[in-house]
Structure formats: C-alpha cells, structure tokens
Amino acid sequence: MTQMTPREIVHALDQYIIGQQEAKRSVAIALRNRWRRMQLDDSLRGEVVPKNILMIGPTGVGKTEIARRLAKLAGAPFIKVEATKFTEVGYVGRDVESIIRDLVEMAMKMVREQAKEEVAHKAEDATEERILDALLPRPRGSEYDHARDESSTRQTFRKKLREGQLDDKEIDIEITPQGGGFDISAPPGMEEMTSQLQSMFSNMGKQKSETRRVTVEEARRLLHDEEAAKLVNEEQIKHRAIEAVEQNGIVFLDEIDKVAKRGDSGSGGDVSREGVQRDLLPLIEGSTVSTKHGMVKTDHILFIASGAFHLSKPSDLIPELQGRLPIRVELQALTPDDFKRILTEPSAALTKQYQALLATDGLEVNFTDEGIARIAEIAWQVNDGTENIGARRLHTVMERLLEEPSFQGGDMASPLTIDAAYVDEQLGELATDEDLSRYIL
C-alpha cells in the first residue's frame, strides 16, 4: 500500500478536488494510519482498529470524487458501493456481505497483476522460446526435443524477434483459452452462486487448447499472459489477497443517508432501511465473512461513509451505527470562487477538456479570466435559485455554452474567444429567468 505522508496525499488530492481541506485531511490521516499500523509489533497491531469516517455534505461538492481519487492513491484493496443497492436479509436485493466478497475479488485481481509483474521476465523468456519454436519447428524425434538448439539460425531469428522485425509475420500457436465462455445471469442476491457455477463450468473445459494463426506481435501478448499465469501460484495469491483485504482493505459507502430513517416518518420502507443499517453493524464492528476464496475477518477494514443528508440527519442513523463512525467531516457548499477554481486549477479541468475536444476539429478555443468568472457566477446563481447540485451544474452550463461550437466544429472561425460578453449572449437570458433555468440549466 501507499507510503505517502498525509501532506503528500492532500497535495495529490488538490490536483483534482478544489477546497474541502478538512475532508482531505481526514482521509489522508486515515490512509496514513493504515501504513503506521502495519509498522507496529504483532501484539499491538491487532489492538489498533481503524477510525471510520462519516462525510456529510450537499451533492456535487466532492465526496464521491475524493473516494475515486483515494482509490488510485491507496495501493490497497478498495471498493466503492452505494448503500441503496443493499437490503435487509430476507428482502429482494443484495445482502451487505457481498461488499466483502466484491472487495476480495478486487484484491485477487490486484494481487494477481502484481504476481504476474514479478514473474514478467521469466514469462518473456518462455514466450520468446515458444515463438521461436513456431518460427523454426524442430524435427520430430530429434535429440533437440528436450534441449534448446542454439544454432546460428535460431540466434539470427532471436535477434530479429527482439528488434521487432518479425512482428507482422503470421505463425501458428497453441493456446489454452482463459475461462469456459459461460455467462450466467442471476437475480439480485444470488451473485455468489452464479460466480461458483461459472467457476465450475470454466474449470471443466480448462485443459482444452486450440491452434490459432496470429501475427508474432499478437502471439507475444497471448503467450505472455499464458506463461505468466502458469508461473504464478494461485493458492499464494488467495492467501495474499485475503491478508491484503483484512489488513488494508477500504470500503467507501456512498449514499448512506438514503438508508437513514427520514424524520418522524413511520412508513414501511423505514423497516427495510433500518435493516440495512443493522446488517452493516457487524461488518463495520468486525465479523467473519465467508467468500469462495476463504474466510475474511473485517475487524481492520476501514469504512468511509458519505451522504448528502438533505431529507434526514446523521442523528437519524441508528445509534449503534453512529457510534461506529466516530470521525465526522462536514463538506462545505461551493462558492463562486470555488467554481472559478474548479474551471481552471485541476489538471483535467472542464475548460481544458473542451479545448482539447474542439482542437481535434481544428477549432482553437480560448477562455478569458472574465469569461471564466462569468461562467462560475452563472453556475452559482442557478444553484442558489433552483436546486443546489454543486459542481455538477458546471457540466450543464458548459454544455449549453459550447453547444454551437461543438455542433459546427471546424466550420467556425478560429480562434474562438469565450469572454464575459459571449457568455452573457449564450446564457444571460437563461440565468436571469428562473423558470427557464429550472428546466434548461
């Protein structure tokens, strides 16, 4: 997992997310504490439990984006799930234990890729020999069947192969198809059974190989994957994946407010919502979940929950669940200045995205500071006057603003300058007419 310090993690998040320093600091400290815990003695390590986080804030201010970026930084098994997908055991829908099963599958994939990288050099050597065997078939029954013939011809072909001179040449290779090709659909809540059936069917046809005629370049890719798969130890991968989940796993629970009881309502839906919360309790507190790869203890998995809490409050969650989310972080609503920074500062800001997209048609687009300030002001006004959807409003505003250039592309006069006057010409009437902006922006 990552060895970045909290300061470095916050700096990395700053490249994509504007503001929300308190939330960034909390997740950075939580992530660093995962690494710190792994440096402790075994006797103390088992006693240090993660401090789970509850992020509270309106929609579109960066809660989910923090999770997405954190997943890339973590270098640990990470899964993001929506709490609304799960139901109480006995109802139609997924049960909460499938979160851990999915997390284990993510870890298996991650550890397998790492294991393949570790044996990449050996796999490359074996791949090269198999391609040379296809290019220079050996005589049957010769004394070289079990020993490599390092003749001058083979060395010449090896040199050409490494230099890429034979990439376009077609050869016949024998490969074993990965998986059995079965795709089984199942109703919600039965994913585990489906997975086991697929595994069973794919194992039945595992040993059958087929001959394919492909180019050397494609053969190198296909054979490398097959040779790497032969070299890795599946049992060791399972053991490492389960250990990674138990010690470093992170679960991001989005939309947690949607399973909270809403005010004083006593509707039937609240029964199922409260059931989901009660099912989450043992996972967050620490329990053992059965997966097809083995038993997984959840005692040291970090849970980060988030929700907008428009129609409910954090106190509407059941008290036991509140107690298991001890760190509370409130994300702030975005200001006009935040909108302006969102349009310019991130490495993949919206303005840069549109400039790159339209440049493919030969249309150069330039944004002035006044134009960006006006776009930010309009987005904030519409949020303030209608429904506050945070930074997502910028997508709607920008799409409307650049609708004509996007349609005409290279037919428009280049360069196109987006200044305050152009923004007012395209969006001014919509921004001032609240009824119109309610439907269009």
From Swiss-Prot:
Biased segments, Basic and acidic residues type: 140-152
Protein name: ATP-dependent protease ATPase subunit HslU
Cleaved signal peptide residues: none
CDD domains xrefs: RecA-like_HslU (cd19498)
Organism lineage: Bacteria, Pseudomonadati, Pseudomonadota, Gammaproteobacteria, Oceanospirillales
Organism: Chromohalobacter salexigens (strain ATCC BAA-138 / DSM 3043 / CIP 106854 / NCIMB 13768 / 1H11)
Residues annotated to bind ATP: I18, G60, V61, G62, K63, T64, E65, D254, E320, R392
Subunit structure: A double ring-shaped homohexamer of HslV is capped on each side by a ring-shaped HslU homohexamer. The assembly of the HslU/HslV complex is dependent on binding of ATP.
Lineage top rank: taxon: Bacteria
Bilayer-crossing regions: none
Record carries keyword GTP-binding: no
Location(s), subcellular: Cytoplasm
GO CC, one annotated term: HslUV protease complex
InterPro entries named in the record: AAA+_ATPase, ATP-dep_Clp_protease_ClpX, ATPase_AAA_core, Clp_ATPase_C, HslU, P-loop_NTPase
GO BP annotations, alphabetical order: protein unfolding; proteolysis involved in protein catabolic process
Residue numbers spanned by region Disordered: 131-158
Keyword terms: ATP-binding, Chaperone, Cytoplasm, Nucleotide-binding, Stress response
An MF annotation (GO) of this entry: ATP binding
Reported function: ATPase subunit of a proteasome-like degradation complex; this subunit has chaperone activity. The binding of ATP and its subsequent hydrolysis by HslU are essential for unfolding of protein substrates subsequently hydrolyzed by HslV. HslU recognizes the N-terminal part of its protein substrates and unfolds these before they are guided to HslV for hydrolysis.
